[in-house]
């Protein structure tokens, strides 16, 4: 369970941390360097993801990308839509599909920052507007890895002679960063993650511009108000802010590893960051030899892998108050002994005592069909603003067949996921605004289903969650949740 101790103080009593000389002192130093940044990341994201003063150059780039995307859509689709009179027959569906097509093409033209937003949209099933999720999955956006020559220059500027060499080819990469094998000056093999050049500046500018665009769309297109696109802009900004400073990667890895150690999770290995080698643009960690999850997931034992993945997300969140909040194939590896390994933890979910109790109470309410209890849980988490008709919200939840416990649980994981999606739609319709950490937690549950499907088509999320479900009464008693 989380405590008032700092991460360094908790690491000081950890067997996992003791293996790396100097790690505890390094953690204390990293905490001092970015304490204010880490504690205010949600507020910073909220400020950026609001309409405000726009950066001139990036705004011009965004405007050009939007005009090109709109022109491409008009040339390819508008004549057919006019001929079929879709805007008259299906105005809401036509508006959503058209906006999704244009925005997806605009993200392509915005480069790596746009690709990262698309990736976050893809991961946010049930939370991001569904028409956007469908579009980026139908037409995925990818970016190539940064050249090895550039990576070596970044590492040399960051760490000088401390890192002797870095492999040209990345083990894995995302629009934000990439991971390479490397060798320290003393011959020790490590893994080095570097931030993509310029991504931090583009991300800051794009957040403000996208917020202005999302606000305008909410006002001009009624069909887009219910999904609350501004809320998604805030979610994406929060995640990208944390990912952009790789000192967070070092601290997140330590926090996750301490939770794994305390919970006794044996099916996953978390590498230790190397003391003295963590800066905003680069970080070095222990070398974890393995194969990318994307190509080797089918070789895992489904049950053991499911326990490990649930352990670092749902179980860690409810028991320890921290969880891996960006669990995607690029952040996982498969070891030769059949275990998983963490190759990246750029985003860590951190519950306050109130959000932790709220999440626990909500899950218990879902399983028992206590809809009033579910709304009380959301109030406890700070998700229900003033002016919400609570009684009507409870009635709407209770009147939805797909949210009844028997309907959600008897149909397997697909029924459960469909129920969560229905619940999100109802909550947004009532203008609920859950804290970002709760949104990240819900998103992690959807990510689990996707990862388990890669391991085995027969893997079932509900079965994997049962050990945690069985612990809910004890956790409720521990946290005084009624």
Task: Give the ranges of each region predicted by the language model.
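Helix-rich C-lobe and terminal helical cap/extension of kinase-like folds
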Residues: 10, 15-38, 42-53, 93, ...
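Short, amphipathic alpha-helical segments that act as regulatory/interfacial helices
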Residues: 111-115, 211-214, 254-257, 424, ...
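Conserved ATP phosphate-binding architecture of protein kinases
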Residues: 178-184
């Amino acid at each position: 369970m989380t405590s008032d101790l700092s991460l360094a103080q908790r690491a000081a009593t950890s067997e996992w941390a003791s293996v790396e000389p100097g790690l505890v002192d390094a953690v204390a130093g990293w905490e001092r360097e970015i304490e204010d940044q880490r504690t205010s990341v949600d507020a910073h994201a909220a400020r950026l993801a609001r309409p405000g003063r726009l950066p001139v150059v990036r705004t011009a780039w965004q405007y050009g990308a939007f005009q090109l995307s709109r022109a491409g859509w008009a040339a390819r689709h508008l004549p057919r839509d006019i001929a079929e009179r879709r805007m008259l027959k299906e105005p809401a569906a036509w508006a959503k599909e058209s906006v999704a097509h244009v925005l997806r093409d605009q993200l392509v033209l915005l480069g790596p920052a746009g690709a990262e937003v698309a990736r976050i949209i893809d991961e946010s099933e049930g939370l991001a507007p569904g028409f956007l999720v469908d579009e980026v999955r139908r037409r995925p956006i990818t970016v190539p890895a940064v050249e090895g020559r550039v990576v070596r220059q970044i590492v040399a500027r960051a760490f000088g002679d401390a890192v002797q060499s870095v492999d040209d080819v990345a083990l894995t990469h995302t629009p934000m960063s990439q991971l390479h094998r490397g060798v320290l000056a003393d011959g020790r093999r490590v893994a080095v993650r570097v931030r993509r050049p310029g991504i931090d500046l583009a991300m800051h500018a794009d957040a403000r511009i996208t917020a202005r665009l999302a606000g305008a769309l909410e006002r001009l297109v009624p069909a887009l108000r219910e999904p609350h696109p501004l809320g998604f802009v805030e979610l994406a900004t929060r995640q990208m802010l944390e990912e952009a400073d790789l000192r967070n990667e070092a601290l997140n890895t330590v926090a996750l590893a301490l939770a794994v150690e305390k919970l006794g999770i044996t099916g996953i290995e978390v590498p230790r960051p190397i003391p003295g080698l963590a800066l905003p643009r680069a970080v070095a960690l222990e070398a974890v030899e393995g194969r990318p999850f994307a190509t080797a997931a089918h070789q895992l034992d489904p049950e053991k892998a499911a326990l490990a993945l649930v352990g670092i997300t749902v179980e860690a969140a409810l028991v320890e108050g921290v969880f891996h909040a960006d669990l995607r194939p690029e952040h996982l590896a498969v070891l030769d002994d059949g275990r998983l390994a963490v190759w990246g933890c750029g985003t860590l979910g951190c519950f306050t005592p109130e959000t932790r109790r709220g999440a626990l109470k909500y899950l218990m309410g879902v399983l028992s069909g206590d809809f009033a209890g579910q709304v009380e849980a959301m109030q406890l988490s700070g998700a229900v603003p003033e002016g919400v008709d609570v009684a009507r919200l409870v009635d709407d939840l209770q009147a939805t067949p797909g949210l009844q416990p028997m309907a959600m649980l008897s149909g397997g994981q697909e029924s459960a996921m469909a129920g969560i999606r229905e619940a999100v739609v109802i909550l947004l319709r009532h203008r609920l605004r859950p804290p970002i950490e709760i949104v990240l937690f819900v998103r992690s549950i959807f990510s689990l289903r996707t990862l388990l499907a890669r391991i085995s088509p027969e893997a079932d999320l509900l079965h994997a969650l049962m050990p945690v479900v069985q612990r809910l009464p004890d956790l409720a008693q521990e946290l005084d949740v009624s």
